[in-house]
């Protein structure tokens, strides 16, 4: 831990420099060249060396080798792809399925621009954006839960 030099604000020389705008980072250690040339490369190279060292000394085998003769019937993607996977399963036309799948990120990008109000305002005072977000969350949960069910029960979630 370094020693920080505290400025004496009663010093007339310092007050004159501050009045001229020369007080920024006047006290302390400058970032150039001390940090940027010496400390940052050491940290970056040390991190890379630790990562490579761990990978060489202790390699981890991820999962088990694939067996093409023992593939499960229901192959599922990772859980965060379930809603989009469900869209592809339920839409009969491949083109419209892919179109709906690619429209998901574009739909998410439009939500902040639905209402022209201050973005730091209380979200409950933005009823359109809040309702679109809540409806989208419910639909995503519905599609995500339906993706783990067989195709016959996926749209009704097995309830109807």
Swiss-Prot record:
Cysteine disulfide links: none
Organism: Welwitschia mirabilis
Function: Component of the cytochrome b6-f complex, which mediates electron transfer between photosystem II (PSII) and photosystem I (PSI), cyclic electron flow around PSI, and state transitions.
Complexes and interactors: The 4 large subunits of the cytochrome b6-f complex are cytochrome b6, subunit IV (17 kDa polypeptide, petD), cytochrome f and the Rieske protein, while the 4 small subunits are petG, petL, petM and petN. The complex functions as a dimer.
GO biological process: photosynthetic electron transport chain
Keyword Zinc assigned: no
Gene designation per UniProt: petD
Name recorded for this polypeptide: Cytochrome b6-f complex subunit 4
Recorded superkingdom: Eukaryota
Alphabetical keyword list: Chloroplast, Electron transport, Membrane, Photosynthesis, Plastid, Thylakoid, Transmembrane, Transmembrane helix, Transport
GO MF term list: electron transporter, transferring electrons within cytochrome b6/f complex of photosystem II activity; electron transporter, transferring electrons within the cyclic electron transport pathway of photosynthesis activity; oxidoreductase activity
Entry-linked Pfam families: Cytochrom_B_C (PF00032)
Taxonomic lineage: Eukaryota, Viridiplantae, Streptophyta, Embryophyta, Tracheophyta
